[in-house]
Amino acid sequence: MPIITLPNGDQKSFDHPVSVMEVAQSIGPGLAKNTVAGRVNDRLVDACDLITEDSTLQIITPKDEEGLEIIRHSCAHLVGHAVKQLFPEAKMVIGPVIEEGFYYDIWMPCPFTLDDMAAIEERMKKLIDQDYDVIKKMTPRDEVIKVFTDRGEEYKLRLVEDMPEEKAMGLYYHQEYVDMCRGPHVPNTKFLKSFKLTKISGAYWRGDAKNEQLQRIYGTAWADKKQLAAYIKRIEEAENRDHRKIGKALDLFHMQEEAPGMVFWHANGWTIYQVLEQYMRKVQQDNGYQEIKTPQIVDFTLWEKSGHAANYAENMFTTHSESRNYAVKPMNCPCHVQVFNQGLKSYRDLPIRLAEFGSCHRNEPSGSLHGIMRVRGFTQDDAHIFCTKEQIGKEVADFIKLTLDVYKDFGFEEVQMKLSTRPEKRVGDDALWDLAEKSLADALDAAGLEWELQPGEGAFYGPKIEFSLKDCLGRVWQCGTIQCDFNLPVRLDASYVTEENERDQPVMLHRAILGSFERFIGILIEHYAGFMPPWLSPVQACVMNITDSQAEASEQVVAKLKENGLRAISDLRNEKIGFKIRERTLERIPYLLVLGDREVEEGTVNVRTRSGKNLGTMSVDAFIDLVKSAVAERGRYIVE
């Protein structure tokens, strides 16, 4: 009979097969009350599952990460229960857990409305109040088919067909409602009280737009009301920081139906874009990169030779001219190899670092487009380093330092790094992979950084390091990458002459710091809520007169600011100064300069910040020095 070993080493003996819940009850009623599931011999199981042999056991509660995932998964089933009660004609599809929540895909003859979502949420609450047990039954395959046939659940039957090897399946009963799942699930609906449905969207069966359209109901669930309230507050803050909303309010950009996934940059937004480009241009020049420019449209044969046509064709925009097929480039790497291939290269020439602000286009699904964060036309701060195997380590180490310095300039101090290593299917010999992986790991260690290993997650052509930023809301954005490539130089005949006067292929390092300009600007907008640091602000100063008699002097101040490289405007409207200050504050302009008769007479300006802090009266030269100092500090400078 089983001996159960607990995480603290204590052991409990039983003279009969025992369930996870029974073990919890033997430890104490408080633990049993909070038991969601168990981890038996490192495998998650339901609280009702029996343990028949000597085993290790961890009791899973809502405080555990796995417990929270189980709560969310069970909430998805609860959506199904409520939907079938309110809309019997609905056909249930799948309801998985996602980051911080869950969704359920449902076939309906007509779309759900927001009122429908509210009604579903209300019904879920009533079902939770009934405090019923969730019953698990392992059911033979034939009986599972009969259950879903009798209920007319055709999508569930299709899912059963996808699992021909399964002889028995777990059915979970929420009263009269039944769903199919590997589990585990909560033992009782009392664990599901802290949830909220968040939105409705469209989806397709199996994610294929050629298939029938489904309705997707999203929700979130947490261990308690406090966690739920904190999440809702964070989401509300994220909505207030939505780059699309701020982009419109600050006249930065717009999108329109005639060019889906393409950005119409307005003057203010384009100013931010240009600041980024000029900054990255200088950074790359200072670090030994040569800036190049390659064609937008390239004969399709190059993409066939590079391998992109075989693996990426559906995401490429193509065109035809004079009996030739072309593709609008979705990435820059094959073109950079063409530049490298011009002229004979020696080992003495390496490393060669080629950088391009490459404009790329990818035919992303329309449903995935999101403001300037997910677009079809974008520009990358793209570069490729051609080097010898022995140079990988130094190039990666230099890139890591450069990348972290750039992120600090934009105000991002917390950066996560992940090293992805060889997958099972790969090109290149093991010795080359050993060298590359060690070079990347050593570079991370030498920088004194914490990093996460992702075994088997590298591309088939080489290992990589990914850099992810954490913003002010704790959200993580993957931006930078450096990727070893042993494949493309071979496919595109890149070579150099070695010290032994032989031909060899260089290693190609794909690298980007910002990723795409469009997405990075979106991240900046949301991180700063539009209150950009002075160096990134489209307008750094607005000069305002109190009466018409100061208009000429105000224009002279603006002219001097511009002569000194500041981005400045004037507001000479015949409005009260308080009104003008309020309006320009809403535009998030860092500095507001006011001129009255006294300032004109003394040759000074009265300076206040967009947060309302009065910096007092100072000379124009002193103000110029103040702004230049703020700009020099970049993202480290906070306008009070």
UniProtKB/Swiss-Prot annotation:
Which CDD domains does the UniProt entry name for this protein?
TGS_ThrRS, ThrRS_anticodon, ThrRS_core
Would the keyword RNA-binding turn up in this protein's UniProt record? yes
- Which Enzyme Commission numbers does its entry carry? 6.1.1.3
Q: Which domain of life is it from?
A: Bacteria
Residues bound to Zn(2+): 333, 384, 510
* Reaction it catalyzes: tRNA(Thr) + L-threonine + ATP = L-threonyl-tRNA(Thr) + AMP + diphosphate + H(+)
Cofactor(s), by name: Zn(2+)
Q: Which InterPro entries match?
A: aa-tRNA-synt_IIb, aa-tRNA-synth_II, aa-tRNA-synth_II/BPL/LPL, Anticodon-bd, Anticodon-bd_dom_sf, Beta-grasp_dom_sf, TGS, TGS-like
Record flagged with keyword Aminoacyl-tRNA synthetase: yes
Domain TGS residues, every copy: 1-61
Q: Name one GO cellular component term.
A: cytosol
Record-linked Pfam families: HGTP_anticodon, TGS, tRNA-synt_2b, tRNA_SAD
Task: Name the family the entry cites.
Answer: Belongs to the class-II aminoacyl-tRNA synthetase family.
Task performed by this protein: Catalyzes the attachment of threonine to tRNA(Thr) in a two-step reaction: L-threonine is first activated by ATP to form Thr-AMP and then transferred to the acceptor end of tRNA(Thr). Also edits incorrectly charged L-seryl-tRNA(Thr).
HAMAP family associated with the record:
Thr_tRNA_synth
- Full protein name: Threonine--tRNA ligase
Species, as recorded: Acinetobacter baumannii (strain SDF)
**Gene name tied to this protein:** thrS
